Amino acid sequence: MSELDAKLNKLGVDRIAISPYKQWTRGYMEPGNIGNGYVTGLKVDAGVRDKSDDDVLDGIVSYDRAETKNAYIGQINMTTASSFTGVQGRVIGYDILRSPEVDKAKPLFTETQWDGSELPIYDAKPLQDALVEYFGTEQDRRHYPAPGSFIVCANKGVTAERPKNDADMKPGQGYGVWSAIAISFAKDPTKDSSMFVEDAGVWETPNEDELLEYLEGRRKAMAKSIAECGQDAHASFESSWIGFAYTMMEPGQIGNAITVAPYVSLPIDSIPGGSILTPDKDMEIMENLTMPEWLEKMGYKSLSANNALKY
């Protein structure tokens, strides 16, 4: 048992999050899960479709395409949480199946917190990649949410269309859509919650390079909001990881950009050497394995190697 879990157990908290299903993860609080904990991950993606004469259907299909891009969360009943992963939680790629890229990462910049400490800000791509590796993609599905399951998610999104004639552009329309997610890890996870911050917007010029520059500015704005939220609760964070997704639209297309942090339990057959009879040991196994070690033990090829994933 980790030192953190030993401390939490004394407070009556367990972070066990095991699904009785084979292959599929299940949503936090679904009946039959083992343990009172949850596992979360970071997903930001964007999808498009050609515009039809039905705005509602266009929104449904473009949202579905964002859900099924990269880390596969298709066919779920998504319910909305606020934006915290607290004493019951672990994050894929960080707390379990840790990505080596997390330990190699260098801060992009720092933000001063209410207590005078500096909060290092990192690119969240290693954590985004980690969720893809665990859930799999639409074409290569691994331990994704069970079809039709009820998955609690921290989520936000934006939908916008690009008219066939750019001269007809109206407020709320644009050339692209983008989304962003941040996870900030509490310095003292026995006292404070780690925190998600989500953002999304419409891009109103045809220049993609300018959008990328703009998103770097959004990262600084998000870092400032993280520090301010920490001040409100007198909570300090040890690091923040911020990632983006975007898509540019062709004339006559509609785009949807989403930011999602699903709260799930882990199927036992995704845990090498795991047993439904020893859920506490199962969580320890996943905590002690790095992502490359897990991929090797499961016989999976990396989906994110060589920067293969675009968000």
From Swiss-Prot:
Keywords: Decarboxylase, Lyase, Pyruvate, Zymogen. This is Histidine decarboxylase proenzyme. Substrate binds at D64, S82. It comes from Lactobacillus sp. (strain 30a). Its EC number is 4.1.1.22. It holds the Pfam family HDC. SUPFAM superfamilies: Pyruvoyl-dependent histidine and arginine decarboxylases. The record marks S82, S83 as: Cleavage (non-hydrolytic). It comes from the Bacteria. It catalyses: L-histidine + H(+) = histamine + CO2. Binds 1 pyruvoyl group covalently per subunit. The proenzyme is a hexamer of identical pi chains; each pi chain monomer is cleaved to form a small (or beta) chain and a large (or alpha) chain by non-hydrolytic self-catalysis. The modification Pyruvic acid (Ser) is found at S83. The gene is hdcA. GO terms for molecular function: histidine decarboxylase activity. Its cofactor is pyruvate. It is an enzyme of class 4 (lyase). GO terms for biological process: L-histidine metabolic process.
